[in-house]
Amino acid sequence: SSKKLYERGMTSIASETVCYPGKMVHGHIQSLIDKGVKTIFYPAVTHEYREDKTSDNHYNCPVVISYSEIIKNNVPDLKKKNIKFINPFMTLNDKENLKDRLCQVFSYYFADLNISKSEIRDAVDAAKEEEFAFKADIRRAGEEAVEKIQKENLKGIVLAGRPYHLDPEINHGMPELINSLDMAVLTEDSICHLAQVQRPLRVVDQWVYHSRLYKAAEFVKKYDNIELVQLNSF
C-alpha cells in the first residue's frame, strides 16, 4: 500500500469514519480495475479460525465481515466496466463448511472452469496445512526471540495489532523505529501461545485479534524487559 494508492480510491469512500485500512481497500480495488482485471473475488469472512478455545467467540470485526458489500455498492467502475465481483459470505473456522461453501461458489460462478469438488476440497486441506505450518514458524521465531532477549539482557516490544499492520503504509514505520532504539520487535501472534488469560475477563472476548492481544498482555506481565505497544488505525 501507499499514500498514492489510497488516493486512487478516495472518491468511492462512503464514510470518513471508517478505519484507514478500510479506506485503503478502495485504492486496491481501483488498482485492480485499472489493470484490467475482470474478476475480483472478495469474500465476506464472518469468523476466523478459533485459536483460543476458551474465548467467547471468534468473529472478524464488522468492517472485515461486511466491507466487500460496501465496495460492491460504492465503486462505480465495477458496474461501468462489467467486472465480475464475487463476495460470498463464509467462515474460516469450520474446514468442512468452508469446503462446502467454496464448492457452491465455484459451481455457480466458475462452472466453465470445470473444477471438481474433490479438487476444491484437496485445495482447502492443503491451504489449511500450510496456514498451520506458517503459524508454527511464527511461534517458533517468537520463542527464539524471547530466548535471545533474556539470554543477552535486551529490551523487547510486543507490537500488537492486526494482520494489516504488517503493511508499511499502515504501520507508519513503527517496527523500524523501535528497532532503531535497540529494542527487539515481536508480533503478538509470535508469543501469545506462551500465556493464558485469567478468565472471566471484564470484556466480551469475541474478536480473534483481541483474544491474541489479551494473551500477549498476559505474557508481557511476566517480564521486566518486555513491554507491549498496541497499534490502532481508527
Regions found by a protein language model. Give the residues of each.
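An N-terminal assembly and electron-transfer interface module characteristic of large anaerobic redox
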Residues: 1-234
